[in-house]
Amino acid sequence: MMYRPDVVRARKRVCWEPWVIGLVIFISLIVLAVCIGLTVHYVRYNQKKTYNYYSTLSFTTDKLYAEFGREASNNFTEMSQRLESMVKNAFYKSPLREEFVKSQVIKFSQQKHGVLAHMLLICRFHSTEDPETVDKIVQLVLHEKLQDAVGPPKVDPHSVKIKKINKTETDSYLNHCCGTRRSKTLGQSLRIVGGTEVEEGEWPWQASLQWDGSHRCGATLINATWLVSAAHCFTTYKNPARWTASFGVTIKPSKMKRGLRRIIVHEKYKHPSHDYDISLAELSSPVPYTNAVHRVCLPDASYEFQPGDVMFVTGFGALKNDGYSQNHLRQAQVTLIDATTCNEPQAYNDAITPRMLCAGSLEGKTDACQGDSGGPLVSSDARDIWYLAGIVSWGDECAKPNKPGVYTRVTALRDWITSKTGI
């Protein structure tokens, strides 16, 4: 059989007339121009600009100023939440519902006939809007809609004043408030043992305590000059001159460093017992508050965190039992466990005292580990303000079933902190 290749037939070449080619190009250019025009129109009319305002509002209340004038107290939080809700409702009942982002009380000050609330107000308007017109509309909405606000407290709508501020000023005000942090959606985090690294500004109160330059424990910034940590961190290493505190999401390089002026260990702490496991460290000089470094809120002694509350523990500790500390800060989402469950025989068999709390998972999924000691266990309130609930203290290895992490209960020792620091 002879090999027979396929017959390839020549195709007739089709040539377009020049006017057809020109028409196709012309139509293509028109379509491209329309697409570009629509894109520019969309960007121009849909891009939004953030407007930040410093606002003041007068009000009267039956409560004494001393009851809510102290930042982060239960009464401060309650009063702030009421006023923020009033402002939110004012915008939600106006045509500016979609433009309103948030309001936040940053402090209160006394007046001769009442109290002045100092607030930050954040809105977003289309970039094509006239800035002066925006300012007038925001002021008008507050004046008109706050007249319908139902107290207590009783607000004076005509007292509202707003002043436009830039992002740097806004950040500065927020950074000087306790318990604020970078806005970030908190998904399900794994334990610090193999957990997730965090970004700058997520947990700005976290500190690393280092002895002769080596990380030993975590700590929490509670004001510009004081850290709170665990007492057992200083059992062997007592000389403050050899300790340093670093801040930021990495130990090396750090965002900033400070030496320690003095260390205060609770008088009732007796090693190797875990009870009263709390200490304070005074920094050699104050730290400036920034987006990356600022303080957590301390809860009132009377505040009660509830079993089942979702909390976060952070630290530079090991990824496994008897492992090495990490250079990058990690986080773990844990759940508060009631003391009765934690004191059961299969758990800690009545070893949990009123100065302790348990958090984690009875299945052993989440936990802190070596090197996390002294670090923060924090919980947020309805205003998304974060409070120090516990201090990493002890546990049976790391992430073992029925052996959740044990933390020093901050509310139980809140008065001791005040007695030593005035905070």
From Swiss-Prot:
Location(s), subcellular: Cell membrane
Family from the record: Belongs to the peptidase S1 family.
E.C. code: 3.4.21.-
Signal peptide: none
Disulfide bridge map: 177-297, 217-233, 342-358, 369-398
Positions annotated as glycosylated: 75, 166, 223
Entry comment on modification after translation: N-glycosylated.
Protein function: Serine protease which possesses both gelatinolytic and caseinolytic activities. Shows a preference for Arg in the P1 position.
Topological domain spans for side Cytoplasmic: 1-19
Coiled coil regions, renumbered to chain: none
Topology with respect to the bilayer: Single-pass type II membrane protein
Domain Peptidase S1: 192-422
Active site residues according to the UniProt entry: 232 (charge relay system), 277 (charge relay system), 373 (charge relay system)
One Pfam family in the UniProt entry: Trypsin
Organism: Homo sapiens (Human)
Gene behind the chain: TMPRSS11E
Keywords: Cell membrane, Disulfide bond, Glycoprotein, Hydrolase, Membrane, Protease, Secreted, Serine protease, Signal-anchor, Transmembrane, Transmembrane helix, Zymogen
Cellular-component GO terms for this entry: extracellular region; plasma membrane
Assembly description: Forms a heterodimer with SERPINA5 and SERPINE1.
Mechanisms controlling activity: Inhibited by SERPINA5.
One biological process term in Gene Ontology: proteolysis
Segments on the Extracellular side according to the record's topology features: 41-423
Database matches in SUPFAM superfamilies: SEA domain (SSF82671), Trypsin-like serine proteases (SSF50494)
Lineage start: Eukaryota, Metazoa, Chordata, Craniata, Vertebrata
Protein name: Transmembrane protease serine 11E
UniProt keyword Protease present: yes
